[in-house]
């Protein structure tokens, strides 16, 4: 069973209204920076902060979709650490 720390921010990435990726940020600053970097990729992409229960449910749904060859938008943390 996974344990979630209460000081982390859980978010889901939506592409055209469908959840395609997920992530966890350590603090508000990291969340805002990652949100800006992800949302600037396209107008159809939205990053939404969610609670633990919804995060777990959508995460499971995304991973099951990935097994069915569902195209998942993968955004790594190291790719977003580029200083502008």
From Swiss-Prot:
Q: Out of the domains of life, which is the source?
A: Archaea
Q: What is the designated name of this protein? A: Uncharacterized protein MJ0353
